């Protein structure tokens, strides 16, 4: 629930904490509190080193400077065009062993840095978006023996400590440390996120009620970091070595505002705490311009922040827009699968000119306005964030097994794994490599016998893993596209053990034998494909949504028993259902890329859409949703910070704010064995696994 505050309209963004000792923003009052925690003064710049979004925006996910930070920047800025799987640009491994650059000048650090800053045909100029120190770190990385990172290997995540610091992860809702938050100016303290970070790096966040009170679940006794997560309009607050033992009463937290009004300074620290939809809402521009961005750049491959943190000239934005929008598949490796239309080129031009205006070298942001904090039932929730062993992970799907583990995939690397939710310890696996294919996994499914099925979309394979012995078997699955364009990605499994999937251009749902990868039956449909396909809980039906993107309006319902396919559409309204699942009543639900929950009503044989609270498209869009055992539907805002819960019986929406300004969920898994419901997702922007536990 949101507080009813009017949104002020605008004309419309050393190794990471190898120990807990890095100096960051802390409470203003110096000294030692009654619970033994050390306080130090808050610096003038309101930066919180524990804010993951800030570290992501500033390429601090792996290290503070040097070769390792250069690797971090390379992954975000260079890898997409210079990876070894593509042919359009030179690979950069061994660059300093070459006599000359493609411009003909000698290869040395000065000339390489100059080329990065200037750019060239097909390459943006980085001089206005990377600092001199950023470029120096990239050059040091290119000069090192580590270059160049591919999906075959990723750097270690310095925040993953569950193997070295053994610590039990809480699983309850109440009974732990508690206290009160007060705002010095007298403003409401409701909806403030209070967080404890355990020695193993696992973060637990709870939320204040209208009196400013909060309560953690009972946690293992010991020393924790206490902080305010995503403080945004407040000065950062952090206390180290806070001793927790059962229902410890914590000292009152007093927060100070960074501004006297809702207008926040447009500093990097503030913008890093805004969600993508908040930044887009703040930026100048027409609805046409913002809708053009939404239709082309909001499909889930990255956050809005990954766009808006940059400053490029118009030529460079044009290079990037062309590269991002007209390559085949997620890795952007293959040439366009079909010629680019005149209308698409016109949209490219519109997006390029708008980005150059609002995110050009000379553009200056006005004051930034954040959406109001949530109230009421929205704050009755516990959110837990688990670290994974690799940085730059691109964590995609999650799925629970019968032993309390969560399996996850990695979209652009060979690494996938199993998270022990009781300890935070991850068992990591590496998918076999396919020559010439970008490694990466997409959907994961755990069968009743414990065997794990994982799709490898870029190499066109189905991976089968036996967790008991680690044995892996890969089965090729034919696809209508070349490798490095997506083959089978999303799939589900029928009661008799066959895989059902729909691949691009096939105009069908396909029944596939997982032992051989061969299609055994084809069910024609009227559209090229359904991005997702899910099997009903009774195993009698398969449902698919629309094609990928914002322009689809279709949904399909297959009676598996008879082979009859029902094709539906939402007319001129583009419902754009992406990923989803069945509720207990036989209806399929999908996340709509144009901002709605999309229901395929099986009995009425029609598509329905439900609009969440908050601003509509182009600001709000969904990607993946999943019903729970009660029929309530859960899904994350693709470019927001809220996770949504919808009760179709009552029409009630409940929003839950995440501790980072992302709810970047490519897939949702609902644990139907718990009461209340427990929801899991992999945050694609932070590379963490997130657990949501509502109190009701």
Outline where the language-model segments fall.
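The canonical Cys-X-X-Cys-His
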Residues: 70-85, 123, 138, 142, ...
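C-terminal capping alpha-helices of c-type cytochrome domains
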Residues: 127-159, 327-330, 335-367, 404-406, ...
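Blade-level signature of beta-propeller repeat domains, shared across WD40, Kelch, NHL, RCC1
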Residues: 663-696
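Short, acidic Ser/Thr/Gly-rich low-complexity loop/linker segments typical of extracellular
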Residues: 197-213, 217
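Structural motif
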Residues: 167-190
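Gly/Gly-Pro-rich "capping" loops immediately C-terminal to redox-active cysteine motifs
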Residues: 64-71, 80-115, 302-329, 430-431
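A short, solvent-exposed loop/turn motif at the edges and junctions
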Residues: 199-201, 223, 227-242
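Electrostatic cytochrome c docking/interface patches
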Residues: 35-73, 164-174, 201, 208, ...
């Amino acid at each position: 629930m949101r507080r009813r505050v009017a949104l002020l309209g605008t004309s419309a963004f050393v190794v990471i904490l190898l120990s807990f000792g890095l100096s960051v923003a802390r409470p203003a009052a110096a000294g030692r509190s009654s619970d033994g925690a050390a306080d130090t003064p808050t610096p003038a710049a309101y930066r919180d080193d524990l804010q993951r979004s800030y570290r992501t925006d500033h390429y601090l996910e792996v290290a503070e400077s040097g070769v390792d930070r250069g690797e971090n920047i390379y992954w975000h800025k260079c890898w997409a065009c210079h990876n070894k799987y593509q042919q359009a640009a030179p690979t950069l491994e061994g660059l300093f062993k070459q006599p000359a650059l493609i411009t003909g000048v000698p290869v040395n650090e000065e000339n390489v840095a100059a080329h990065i800053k200037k750019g060239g045909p097909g390459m943006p100029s980085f001089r206005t978006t990377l600092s001199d120190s950023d470029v120096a770190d990239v050059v040091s990385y290119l000069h090192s023996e580590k270059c160049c990172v591919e999906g075959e290997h990723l750097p270690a995540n310095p925040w993953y400590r569950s193997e070295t610091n053994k610590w039990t992860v809480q699983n309850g809702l109440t009974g732990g440390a508690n206290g009160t938050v007060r705002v010095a100016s007298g403003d409401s303290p409701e909806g403030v996120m209070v967080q404890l970070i355990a020695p193993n790096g696992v973060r637990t966040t709870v939320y204040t009620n209208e009196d400013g009170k909060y309560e953690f679940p009972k946690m293992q006794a010991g020393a924790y970091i206490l902080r305010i997560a995503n403080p945004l309009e407040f000065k950062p607050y952090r206390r180290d070595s806070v001793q927790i033992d059962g229902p410890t009463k914590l000292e009152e937290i007093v927060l100070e505002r960074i501004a006297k009004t809702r207008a926040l300074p447009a500093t990097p620290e503030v913008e890093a705490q805004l969600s993508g939809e908040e930044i887009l809402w703040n930026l100048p521009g027409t609805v046409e311009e913002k809708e053009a961005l939404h239709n082309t750049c909001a499909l889930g491959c990255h956050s809005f922040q990954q766009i808006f943190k940059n400053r490029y000239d118009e030529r460079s934005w044009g290079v990037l827009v062309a590269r991002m929008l007209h390559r085949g598949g997620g890795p952007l490796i293959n040439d366009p699968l079909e010629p680019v239309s005149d209308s698409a080129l016109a949209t490219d031009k519109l997006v390029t000119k708008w980005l150059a205006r609002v995110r050009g070298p000379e553009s200056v942001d006005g004051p930034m306005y954040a959406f109001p904090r949530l109230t009421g039932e929205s704050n009755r929730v516990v959110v837990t964030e688990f670290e994974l062993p690799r940085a730059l992970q691109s964590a995609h799907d999650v799925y629970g097994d019968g032993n309390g583990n969560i399996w996850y995939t990695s979209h652009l690397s060979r690494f996938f794994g199993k998270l022990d939710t009781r300890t935070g310890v991850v068992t990591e696996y590496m998918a076999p490599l396919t020559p010439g294919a970008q490694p990466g996994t997409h959907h994961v499914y755990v069968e009743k016998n414990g065997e794990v099925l994982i799709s490898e979309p870029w190499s066109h394979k189905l991976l089968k893993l036996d967790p008991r012995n680690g044995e892996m078997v890969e089965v090729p699955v034919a696809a209508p596209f070349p490798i490095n364009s997506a083959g089978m990605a999303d799939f589900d499994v029928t009661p008799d053990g066959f895989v059902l999937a729909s691949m691009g251009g096939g105009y069908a749902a396909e029944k596939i034998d997982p032992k051989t990868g061969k299609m055994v039956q084809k069910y024609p449909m009227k559209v090229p494909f359904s991005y997702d396909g899910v099997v009903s809980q009774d195993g009698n039906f398969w449902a698919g949504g629309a094609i990928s993107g914002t322009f689809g309006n279709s949904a399909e319902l297959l009676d598996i028993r008879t082979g009859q396919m029902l094709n539906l559409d939402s007319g001129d309204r583009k419902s754009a259902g992406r990923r989803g699942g069945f509720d207990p009543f036989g209806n399929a639900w999908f996340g709509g890329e144009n901002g709605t929950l999309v229901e395929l009503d099986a009995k009425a044989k029609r598509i329905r859409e439900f609009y969440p609270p908050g601003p509509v498209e182009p600001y709000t869009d969904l990607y993946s949703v999943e019903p729970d055992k009660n029929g309530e539907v859960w899904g994350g805002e693709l470019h927001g910070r809220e996770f949504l819960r919808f009760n179709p019986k009552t029409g009630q929406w409940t929003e839950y704010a995440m501790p980072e300004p992302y709810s970047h969920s490519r897939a949702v898994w609902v644990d139907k064995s718990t009461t209340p419901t427990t929801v899991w997702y992999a945050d694609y922007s932070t590379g963490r696994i997130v657990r949501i536990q509502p109190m009701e």
